[in-house]
């Protein structure tokens, strides 16, 4: 899962800090979630999905996180 999130984030040219800001969490917290140490909350998954779609990546939430 984590490699997919990182891959899509890199594909759209965003940093971990930018995604952390999008989610309203610290960069450290985001890094732990992307590394699979902590889980993303449902609302965070939805925000990431919406941002990727806004940036032209047309995929489902399950393709990103599962």
Where are these regions (language model features)?
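Short alpha-helical DNA-recognition segment
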Residues: 14-32
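Residues that mark the N-terminal boundary/hinge immediately upstream of a DNA-recognition element
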Residues: 4, 15, 41-44
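A short, Lys/Arg-rich alpha-helix, primarily the initiator
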Residues: 1-11
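DNA major-groove recognition helix of helix-turn-helix/homeodomain DNA-binding modules
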Residues: 41-61
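Residues within the helices of the helix-turn-helix
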Residues: 6, 17, 62
């Amino acid at each position: 899962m984590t490699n997919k999130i990182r891959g899509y984030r890199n594909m759209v040219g965003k940093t971990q800090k930018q995604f952390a800001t999008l989610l309203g969490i610290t960069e450290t917290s985001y890094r732990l979630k992307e590394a699979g140490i902590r889980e993303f909350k449902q609302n965070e998954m939805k925000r990431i999905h919406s941002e990727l779609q806004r940036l032209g990546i047309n995929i489902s939430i399950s393709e990103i996180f599962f």
